[in-house]
Amino acid sequence: ANVLHQVTPFFLMCDCHDLGVSIGDNFTGKSIPPRDLPSRKTPFNDRLENVLSPDFSPNIFLYDNFPGGIGLSSALFEMRQEVLVACLQTIDGCPCEAGCPSCVGPVRETGEKAKQVARELLENLLLTGI
């Protein structure tokens, strides 16, 4: 969620405060703070262990941070592939080992595998054509 929130404003030519971000769970219908994410093995890559629980159906929501919206979300939807590629390039180009505020967020807040997990999720989103 952090890298999407950092990269998206460049495409929409807006400030990062113009966009809100939330991680949600389809299973419970609730928003989840990043530190409280459940865990399970990922079906995409055996190298990543304990990413999400089987009962967790995650979503990342980027939304207009203005009452009624100003069209940022619909514009973002149209350029979602380019944004995901840019997010992957941002992660790959960051010299940190496990995560930092410039890419996936500080390791103390996101965990030691956050950079690896974010990269894996982005690759799979791009493969599925989201």
Residue ranges and their predicted role:
Residues 1-130:
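Extended, highly charged accessory segments
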